[in-house]
Amino acid sequence: MADIEGLLHEVADAVISCKKEKVLEAVEKARAEVPPEEIIEKGLSAGMNQVGVLFERGKLFLPHVMMAADAMTTGVKLLEADLPAGAEKKLGVIVNGTVEGDVHDIGKSIVSTMLQSAGFEVHDIGRDVPIRDFIEKAKETDADMIGISALMTTTLQGQRDVIELLKEEGLRSRVKVMVGGAPATQAWADKIGADCYAENASEAVAKAKELLL
């Protein structure tokens, strides 16, 4: 029997290399010995998490992340047929965007990519998003969580405004709120009544799982 840990390691490394062919090859090799859920969680997702860490350390750039996510998705698609019925159920629905007045996109995009890779259904509504649009999208998608990014101190208030509007609409008890972005902190999240603060993409995935699973 092949070394399962070694096979999963190969899958993770293939994702980090951002090469689809490598991922397909490694997944094909692993599926003979390893259950599909395990390949997704301990191979593909583990590799993607590592990509997130490397991105945060400045060792990889956004194009690499997008290519790795693409390569990972190819691997997941290959395994879909092997998954037991219902196994591909999404972990939860998340609306993610950057508040109005803020045109920064990169951090938020990587968070969306990582959440998607972890198995959440993510609706990325982009940057410079009006407060009401967060709420409307959450209603439309029946979201479990809203992720609000702000990259400037001047736009931080938008995070509070989304929470206030959720309360006004009677949705606050049903929809969790995660805040992030350079000027955001845990103290700020506590002050405005957010459910959690995430410093980076890996943390965003961990916190989302904590709150929604």
UniProtKB/Swiss-Prot annotation:
Domain B12-binding N-terminal: 1-91
Highest taxon, organism lineage: Archaea
InterPro entries documented for this protein: Cbl-bd_cap (IPR003759), Cobalamin-bd (IPR006158), Cobalamin-bd_sf (IPR036724), Corrinoid_p (IPR012741), Dimeth_corrin_MtbC (IPR048095), Met_Synthase/Corrinoid (IPR050554), Meth_synthase_dom (IPR036594)
Intrachain disulfide bonds: none
A biological process term (GO) from this entry: methanogenesis
A GO term, aspect molecular function: cobalt ion binding
Matching PROSITE patterns: B12_BINDING (PS51332), B12_BINDING_NTER (PS51337)
Pathway: One-carbon metabolism; methanogenesis from dimethylamine
List of residues binding methylcob(III)alamin: 104
KW Mitochondrion (keyword) present: no
B12-binding domain boundaries: 92-213
Keywords recorded for this protein, A-Z: Cobalt, Metal-binding, Methanogenesis, Repeat
SUPFAM superfamilies named among the record's database cross-references: Cobalamin (vitamin B12)-binding domain (SSF52242), Methionine synthase domain (SSF47644)
Function: Acts as a methyl group carrier between MtbB and MtbA.
Family to which this protein belongs: Belongs to the methylamine corrinoid protein family.
NCBIfam families referenced in this protein's UniProt entry, alphabetically: dimeth_corrin_MtbC (NF041607), pyl_corrinoid (TIGR02370)
Record's protein name: Dimethylamine corrinoid protein 3
Organism of origin: Methanosarcina acetivorans (strain ATCC 35395 / DSM 2834 / JCM 12185 / C2A)
Gene: mtbC3
